[in-house]
Amino acid sequence: MASPKETLQRRAARVRRQVKAVANGRPRLSVHRSSKNIYAQIIDDVRGVTLAAASTLDGDLKGKLKTGADSAAAAAVGKLVAERAVKAGVKDVVFDRGAFIYHGRVKALAEAAREGGLSF
C-alpha cells in the first residue's frame, strides 16, 4: 500500500500530465496550498519562466487579510494573480491544481482568477 506522500505525488503527477496534454503552449496557473498560506503563479513551461505570481505573503495583501488560510484570502490571491497576469499580457491559461482537490480555497482562488480576467 502506498504511503500518503506517495499518493499525493502520484495525484500531482497525474494532474500535471493532464494539464500538459491540453496546454497547447498556454501558460499554466499553478496553485500551492499550505496550512497557513496559499500561493499562485502563472508559469510559461515553453520558456521556463514565471510570468506572474501572488500569495498571501505579498505586501499588497498581507496587512489586509485576517488570515492567509481561508477562502477570502484565496479569492484575494486569485484576483491579484489575474490582475498581474493581464498586465503581463496573459489571458488564456490552464489551471494546475497539483495534488489539491478542486474545493474550498483552491476553488475560491480559481473563481476569483476567472472574475479577474483569466480564462480556463
Curated annotation (Swiss-Prot):
Known Pfam families for this protein? Ribosomal_L18p
Q: Name one GO molecular function term.
A: 5S rRNA binding
Checking InterPro entries in the record gives: Ribosomal_uL18_bac-type (IPR004389), Ribosomal_uL18_bac/euk (IPR005484)
UniProt entry keywords in alphabetical sequence: Ribonucleoprotein, Ribosomal protein, RNA-binding, rRNA-binding
Q: Which GO terms describe its cellular component?
A: cytosolic large ribosomal subunit
Set out the biological process GO terms recorded for this chain's protein. Answer: translation
Gene3D superfamilies referenced in this protein's UniProt entry, alphabetically: 3.30.420.100
NCBIfam families the record matches: L18_bact
What is the recorded function of this protein according to its Swiss-Prot or TrEMBL entry? This is one of the proteins that bind and probably mediate the attachment of the 5S RNA into the large ribosomal subunit, where it forms part of the central protuberance.
The family note in this entry says:
Belongs to the universal ribosomal protein uL18 family.
Its assembly, as annotated, is: Part of the 50S ribosomal subunit; part of the 5S rRNA/L5/L18/L25 subcomplex. Contacts the 5S and 23S rRNAs.
Q: Under which name does UniProt file this protein?
A: Large ribosomal subunit protein uL18
Native source organism of the sequence: Brucella canis (strain ATCC 23365 / NCTC 10854 / RM-666)
Q: What is the lineage of its organism?
A: Bacteria, Pseudomonadati, Pseudomonadota, Alphaproteobacteria, Hyphomicrobiales
- The gene it comes from is rplR
